A protein has these predicted regions:
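Basic nucleic-acid-binding interfaces
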Residues: 1-74
Length: 74
């Protein structure tokens, strides 16, 4: 399984759209993206990149494999 690298929030959103997610939409304290009935809460904008640990958790929740994620790399 490939090792992830940190990504910017903008890159995360663009790459999630490749997997069929729409959004981000405003909701509560965090924005979210949707794919069908699945809702994925995404981190708020901040200065740094999204850590490898958080990215791994988001991908697991979105049911996206590490191999598929790496294929969308620019």
């Amino acid at each position: 399984m490939p090792r992830h690298s940190p990504v910017s929030r903008r890159d995360l959103i663009q790459r999630l759209k490749v997997f069929g997610f729409t959004g981000p939409f405003i909701g509560g304290r965090h924005e979210f993206m949707e794919r069908g009935t699945q809702r994925l809460i995404i981190p708020n904008p901040h200065r740094g990149d999204i850590s490898v640990d958080l990215l791994s958790r988001l991908l697991r929740q979105a049911h996206i494999s590490a191999d598929d994620w790496e294929k969308t790399k620019n």
